[in-house]
Amino acid sequence: RRQRQMCIRDRSLIMLCSSIDKTIENLEFLKAIDEKILFVSLASSLSSINNFVVSAGIKNIIFTHPISGSHKSGYENASPNLFNQKNVISVNVNDLQENQTHEIEKIWSSIGSNIINMSLDDHERFLMFTSHLPHLIAYTAMLSIDKEVDISKFSAGGLKEFLRIAESNPDLWADIFSSNSKNLKVGSEIFINNLYRIIDLFK
């Protein structure tokens, strides 16, 4: 604990590049050390973190979500151009001073990212459709394949894309699904209803 405190001494900005549960854990530790530190979360879903932020009375945080990445995790898979020409969603939930938000957005712009400002609710709803639901479908598709089928022999481009997505860190995505469960339930029901409509055409 003391070592962690020494690492953040005199820091004015900390970017939280971790999973949702680790972000909450780190915020719980960091908030008691220096209330002047500005926190920046990079999580894919904001609901769980925001619920903690509200309950803990943390005001000095901004959510930014870079729309980039890969199914591979870990520093060994790092890429210097990961954020170049990629969109970054900026969500200011605490009405931080304009200059604070601007400074964070400048950091992203300096590495080639494009800034999109959005409300928390819109972020959770839009990203459910464009990211969270597709990952859920990919995981479900892999669970649906007969175990006797040799995937390596009989799969082409379509299934390989499902395989790639399903190789994403399951713990990370379990956190995301849980955090955005309200929207994900709605999206899943829409998907299931459309699937049944297609199945009816087979009759």
Predicted features along the sequence, with ranges:
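Short phosphate-binding/catalytic loops that engage adenosine nucleotides
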Residues: 2, 35, 112-113
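Short, small-residue-biased leader/transition segments that mark boundaries at the very start
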Residues: 3-8
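N-terminal Rossmann-like NAD(P) cofactor-binding module of classical short-chain dehydrogenase/reductase
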Residues: 14-15, 40
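Glycine-rich, N-terminal phosphate-binding loop of Rossmann-like dinucleotide-binding domains
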Residues: 17-19, 43, 92
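Rossmann-like NAD(P)(H) cofactor-binding subdomain of soluble oxidoreductases
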Residues: 24-76
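Short, flexible, solvent-exposed loop/turn segments with mixed acidic/basic and small polar residues
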Residues: 30, 76-82, 174-175
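Internal alpha-helical scaffold of NAD(P)-dependent oxidoreductase catalytic cores
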Residues: 80-165
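Interdomain hinge/lid region at the active-site interface
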Residues: 150-203
